[in-house]
A protein has these predicted regions:
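Short, Asp-centered acidic motifs that coordinate Mg2+ and/or phosphate
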Residues: 3, 44-46, 69-70, 104
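Conserved beta-sheet core of the metallophosphoesterase superfamily
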Residues: 52-133, 142
Length: 143
């Protein structure tokens, strides 16, 4: 079977848009034309997106509305700080108590968010170990 990758070149906020990005009001580039092209293709479709918060936004950049199987993202740094019994505290682009800081979400499409190896605004991680994700695709699961 065919596996198709869509790597999105999403705009990053520059310094003047930094506050808007932190507040979750930054306007990302419209990705609909890229998803329209992806819709024309068959097989298992993987979307590579830096920003997990675009998976289920209420705006036009709600990636989960499109026809694909898996989105791989990072950016959230696992919530930077994780408090026991509470969870992730802060994530760039999502603010306090982010929904998509780490882990797996949804069925189809499915989102996998890696905590990654780096840091965000704070050069410290608390109860939040760096990680590299390994994803196994099984042919009989998507034929």
């Amino acid at each position: 079977s065919l596996i198709t990758f869509l790597g999105l070149d999403e705009d990053q906020a520059d310094f003047k848009d930094y506050k808007a990005r932190k507040n979750g009001t930054f306007q990302y580039k419209d990705m609909k034309p890229y998803f329209d092209e992806l819709d024309k293709l068959g097989g298992f479709k993987i979307v590579l997106s830096h920003f997990p918060e675009n998976f289920e936004k209420v705006e036009e950049n709600n990636y989960s509305q499109y026809d694909f199987d898996l989105q791989l993202s990072g950016h959230a740094h696992g919530g930077q700080f994780i408090l026991p019994f509470i969870g992730p505290v802060y994530s760039p682009g999502q603010g306090l108590f982010p929904k998509y800081a780490k882990g797996s979400f949804g069925e189809r499409p499915q989102l996998i968010v890696s905590r990654g190896l780096g840091n965000a605004e704070f050069p410290l991680r608390l109860f939040n170990h760096p990680e590299i994700n390994v994803v196994y695709l099984e042919k009989d699961k998507f034929d």
